[in-house]
Amino acid sequence: MMTEAERASKLAEPAANDTPTRGKGVFYVHTLGCQMNVHDSERIAGVLEADGYVPATEEQYLNHDIDLIVMNTCAVRENAAERMYGTIGLWAELKRERPNLQIAVGGCMAQLDREKIAKKAPWVDAVFGTKNIGSLPQLLDQARIEGHAQVKVQEELNYFPSQLPTDRASKVSSWVAISVGCNNTCTFCIVPTTRGKEHDRRPGDILAEIRQCVDEGAKEVTLLGQNVNSFGYGIGDRFAFSKLLRACGEIDGLERVRFTSPHPAAFTDDVIAAMAETPNVMHQLHFPLQSGSDRILRAMRRSYRSAKFLDILRKIREAMPDAQISTDIIVGFPGETEEDFQETLRVVEEARFASAFTFIYSPRPGTPAAEMEQVPHDVVQDRFERLVALQERITEENLKTFEGRDVEVMVTGASGKKDAATHRVTGREKTGVLVHVGVPEGEPMPQVGDFVTATVTHAGRHNLIADPNPEAGQTYAVRH
């Protein structure tokens, strides 16, 4: 399955009638990392198109018929940096074949390594940060004129990226940033360094963008922030996020609202109530645990403990019994003992997460945890495999509970490997579970953005299959 970042890597739809114009140049955006990076790549594409560039078609990309490649980088994990330099190295050969090709590097690694990137990869033409996406066209022009790399990375946020033009990867499902940056000081995390302190957008601006998305065809929005539920704290309104969720419920045509990611320390009862009482806010939650050990949580500077975390989950499930909750867990944080790890396994077993993004701890230079005593790799690997096995079992057991139930799926495409051959469409049901829906014989294929209600006939390891047989009393219905 593709990651959100891979789906965001920008390719244009092929022209229907004639050869597409090259404009100022044909570009491709290669995205690494989180949902915020995915959204930033939409801004990068929008800025370039506003300056006269044209997104590459798949054929142009495969034939290397490209004038500009932009890499939007991630800095959260060590292998992200390795992937960045490895990929840029491959592009050096492409540039030797096409001397006029320009290469730009942006995102979190650019914010961190700015000068190092230009020195280590002198074939790069422009380096820009997370706070000055809008300057990319000017940097490319200067590099073309001056014949050497242009490096411009700002430390201060002068404007919200949301003010920039946007070329959204999906016309029916949109990302909407409500804040940028983070005020927490987790000892393992580099994000406050790359994204800066938290800055919130005005609620009116957020709602105006959501309405614009709906007017342009979006049926679903995901509210983005490093810590969405601390939205409004800077102006002393700790209820601002729950108010925003309720305001989303008043927008005509907006079918589904999701958000990511909240911080457990700031997850309050008013947010739970808003989720439960606002019909178009989905009962899906990504809720990062990081560790089940209170000792490790303290070392991480995570300002909650496992008992509080589990108590919040209890309240969520009391208010929304159908809620699907995913999480992040770090294995092998410095100083983690077997006893600490057993606490994590205990919490995971009790929490019954729908899914978990599990990571082996990766030291990031400049973070306090990188200076702590590290756990031997073989020990960490063993723990990681045990955690994955536990979560895989829980995920399968959870998905089995969907068998025989009717789910409403918003069609996003035919992204499953076998969808075309099996006459299926793909999308997510209300709580975020991926579903492949079989279209009964004689029925027209639903289109992207349609809502299909179907009976789940089989639970896979990570998704659901709905191959309903209406003659046997199973449900299949399409809503446009």
Curated annotation (Swiss-Prot):
Q: Where in the cell is the protein located?
A: Cytoplasm
Taxonomic placement: Bacteria, Bacillati, Actinomycetota, Actinomycetes, Bifidobacteriales
Q: Which positions are annotated as binding [4Fe-4S] cluster 1?
A: 34, 74, 108
Keywords in alphabetical order: 4Fe-4S, Cytoplasm, Iron, Iron-sulfur, Metal-binding, S-adenosyl-L-methionine, Transferase, tRNA processing
| Domain Radical SAM core: from-to ranges | 168-397
Q: List, for all copies, the residue spans of the domain called MTTase N-terminal.
A: 25-145
> What cofactor does its activity depend on?
[4Fe-4S] cluster
Q: Which protein, by its recorded name, is this?
A: tRNA-2-methylthio-N(6)-dimethylallyladenosine synthase
Q: What is its EC number?
A: 2.8.4.3
What does the note under cofactor report? Binds 2 [4Fe-4S] clusters. One cluster is coordinated with 3 cysteines and an exchangeable S-adenosyl-L-methionine.
- Pfam families in the cross-refs: Radical_SAM, UPF0004
PANTHER family in alphabetical order: CDK5 REGULATORY SUBUNIT-ASSOCIATED PROTEIN 1, MITOCHONDRIAL TRNA METHYLTHIOTRANSFERASE CDK5RAP1
Q: Which domain of life is it from?
A: Bacteria
Subunit structure, interactors included: Monomer.
For this protein, the record's InterPro entries field holds:
Elp3/MiaA/NifB-like_rSAM (IPR006638), Methylthiotransferase (IPR005839), Methylthiotransferase_CS (IPR020612), Methylthiotransferase_N (IPR013848), Methylthiotransferase_N_sf (IPR038135), MiaB_methiolase (IPR006463), rSAM (IPR007197), rSAM_horseshoe (IPR023404)
